[in-house]
Every structure is written in C-alpha cells, then in structure tokens.
Amino acid sequence: MLSNHYNIGVVEAGCDEAGRGCLAGSVYAAAVILPPDYANECLNDSKQLTEHKRILLRQEIERINILNASILAMHRALDQLKVRPEAIIVDGNRFKPYNDIPSTTIVKGDGKYLSIAAASILAKTYRDDYMMQLAEQYPQYDWQSNKGYPTRKHRDAIREFGISPYHRKSFNLLGDTQLSFDF
C-alpha cells in the first residue's frame, strides 16, 4: 500500500511526467493534491491539442531539452491546481524550484506515494491517448503499441520511413553534449 503523504500535515502536490524517454510525441505532466485521509487500494505506479499546438510543444521540447521540458510541464501542471500546495513531491531525482514552495524529489516515488501515483496515471493516460491519435495519421511507426518509446519496431520504421514531424530530433543525454539521432 502506498503512503498517503511525504510531508504530514501540509497541503502537498505530487508530480510526475510521461514521455521523457520517448522518440516521438510530447511530454505530459500532472500534479495532484489528495485529501489527508485519501485511500485507494487500486492506485499505484502506472509504467486535445491541435496539430499546431503539438508541433509547438515538440519545438519547445527540442529547444529546452527533454529534462527541462519535463520540469516545465510539471510547473505548468502545478500552475493549474486550484489549491496552492505547501509542499511538492516529485517522482525522480531532478526538479527545479517552483515559486517558494519546498519540494522533494523521490526516486520511484510513483510506487511510494499516492499523489505521485495519481499524477503518473493522469500524465501517462493522457499522453497515451495523444499517441493513439497520432498513430491514426502515422500507422507505420506502431505508436498504437509503443506510444513513441524506442522499441525495435519503432526504430526500424524510422530507418525505413524517416522521421515524422512528431519525432524528436535531439536529446540532451550527456549533460551539455547534444546527441542527435541519425536514422
């Protein structure tokens, strides 16, 4: 059973993202505040934009790199909360300060805390829906199955058909060194 809160007695938001490790598609993030007495045995880790908006998001991801895009997406999700959290817990090991709210990163937090698990499920399911819509336009990449992740079939399709407008063209995987994919 997951823990209800990391910080007892404060309004806490759990944050997570989906899609950072993908070759295609946008990063989605969610922030969730749960009541102090919330319980749900089913809640656990989870492993309608216009085309123009999706392309703008892809360009933003490439410009600021995928990690920073993930953090920005989480900040934007926090901006949408109707209640201001007193603390933020984030799945993973990196997060940039959000306003003046204390934050804690928790590796595998989506398997430890309910609010992060809920945020993870929201981010993943919304992103999966988005990738299913794109799969209708680009069936050759098998996005209905791989959701943009770098499976063998997906990489083979890139080699055969080239990249789509939704593929990421670069990743910042090695610190300041930019790594470009040449398929």
Across the structure, where does each feature detected by a protein language model lie?
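RNase H-like, Mg2+-dependent phosphodiesterase core
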Residues: 1-183
